[in-house]
Structure formats: structure tokens, C-alpha cells
Amino acid sequence: MPVVVTGSIATDHLMTFPGLFTEQFVEGQMENVSLSFLVDDLVQHRGGAGANMAYGLGLLGLSPVLVGAVGSDFADYQAWLSRHGVDTGSVHWSELKHTARFVCTTDQANNQIASFYSGAMAEASQIELAPVVGRVGAPDLVVVGPNDPTAMVRHTQECRDRGFAFAADPSQQLAWAAGDMIMELVSGAEVLFTNEYESALLLQKTGWTADEVLDRVGCWVTTRAADGVLVRRAGEEPLEVIAVPETKPVEPTGGGDALRAGFIAGRMWGLSLERATQLGSAVATAAVEVIGTQEYDLPRESFLARFGEAFGAEAADEVAAHLPG
């Protein structure tokens, strides 16, 4: 039975300005700003949390089913995902809007001017999981990733109504969501994913204690960047897993999505919480060593060698039994 990944699908358009934005500002004219920058570089990357997680799961051989909304400009991106083992047959295509897009220009001082166009993502709320299940069968897990807020609530409720196990990954949507909505997204999740900041925000907005969160979820996975991962379950001692050392850290964006993919793959393979978290940590490190959230690969031999260096030969053997390639 498949893993269904719901969440955002987007493209990132990143530009570099060979100067300083502040040099373009005119004193006394800040109420009438009209700025234009001649950039010397443009890079386009495939992204979106849902697509990033699906990509990682595809590399790990799980053939995930991606569910989200895109525009008519999605064809090349779709082909890329399909080549990497992702089932895109349940993606909703908008007839009116383009795929969600992040556009960012960075100057020499690392100042940024950015815009986000949600585009077709707003139509994700129209997607029902029942037709997806009718096409691919009942899922082992539904990941409810950051997306159009109405879509996230709808997918979560449908999982409860139909008895599907789901993972809650509210991510950046926690910043604006009210406490009641966060409670709805989290309660009953098999797995809750957050980073440290999101953990604090969740507790603040819901008024729950950490123990009260644990009473409502199967396990709570908190990423802590270079400090590794913390996994908690009600009534058990916390599990801490190190971050696999980076040899050439380049870009942290997408590391969290890659970790989620590795963790979910490990659990779907029947690995222990510890081993699945270690797998997630290793995949995350591979992701942050390249620019672009879907530019990393997992060559079997080198990946297992590195995994073994971090976690031991026995752990590597367990993962090797499932790793494709």
C-alpha cells in the first residue's frame, strides 16, 4: 500500500544582484519607491514541501503518491518527479493559475527581496482523498504537509473519517494558524514533525504542554539542525539521534523535507524509531550538501558507507536490506 504525500508543489527562482540594495535607496523618497535591479544570475529549482518529500521517498524506492495543485507550467516538473519514482497521477491541474512560485533576489550583503505567488496551490482545497485511494488503494500513511490551509484541514479530517494513519507536518503554516486549527491538524497524528522553533510556537498557540501533545500523537519528531533529532513518545524516554556530519554544507533549505522522507521510509520498511531517525538524518545531510532541494542523490554504496561511519555496521546492514540500487 502506498504512502500519499499531500503538500505544496512550487518552483524557486533565485537571482543574484552584484551590488547592494541599500545603494539604490534615495533618502527622503522611501514613500515613493520604484526600484529595478539588473541581476547577473538566475537559477530555477524545483521545490515545495510536498514535492520535496515525495522526491526523497522516490529515491528510497517507495513510489509515493503526490497530491497537490499545480498549473499548466508543471509538465517538465512532472516529468522530473516521474523519473525519480514519484506517482503524479493524483495531482490537480489548475486551468487558471500557474504553479506556486518563490522569486528571490539576493545582493552582495545577503540582503534579500522576495515574493511568493501561491497560484494553483489555492486550489488544493478542492482535492478529495477518496478518488486518490480509489486509484492507488488504501494508503499506509498520508503525509499532511504545508499547503493551502483549508486543504490541510480537509485532508486531516478525511484521514480521521476514513481511518487512514497520517503524519502532521504543519511547518511554516504554524506561524499564522490559530490554536484551534493547529489542534485540529495535530490531534490523532501517527507522527508529528516540527523543528525547534515550530515546537515552541505550537505549545504557545495551543496552550498544551509537551506531555499533552504526546498524549495526542504517536510520536513527535523535532529537528534541531546541527544538534540532530529528538524523538518523543508518551511514557518513554526521549530518543536523541545525531546529525550526520556534513562534508560540504551548502544550503540548509530542504533538509527538513529530506529528513522526513528518510524517517517515513524507514518506518514503512519496519525499522525501529531509532533506525528510521538515523536514516532521516543521513538523507537530510545529503540534501543540504547541494544547492536545490531536489538535486541530491543517494548512491547506494557511498550512502551506506557514510551511514555506517555515523551509526555503525549493524545499522548500515539493516538499511542495506531495503535500500534500492
Regions found by a protein language model. Give the residues of each.
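A glycine-rich beta-to-alpha transition motif near the start of alpha/beta enzyme domains, typified by
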Residues: S63-G89
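Gly/Ala-rich phosphate-binding loop of Rossmann-like dinucleotide-binding domains
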Residues: G58, R160, M268
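A short acidic, amphipathic alpha-helical/loop segment
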Residues: T150-E158, D180-L185, R275
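Conserved phosphate-binding/catalytic region of the ribokinase-like
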Residues: G207-G325
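Conserved phosphate/ATP/ADP-binding segment of small-molecule kinases
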Residues: R160-A165, S171-V241, K248
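Conserved phosphate-binding/catalytic loop of the ribokinase/pfkB sugar-kinase fold
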Residues: G89-S94, F102-L141, G145-P146
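Glycine-rich phosphate/adenosyl-contacting loop at the front of the ribokinase-like
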Residues: M1-V65, D76, E314-G325
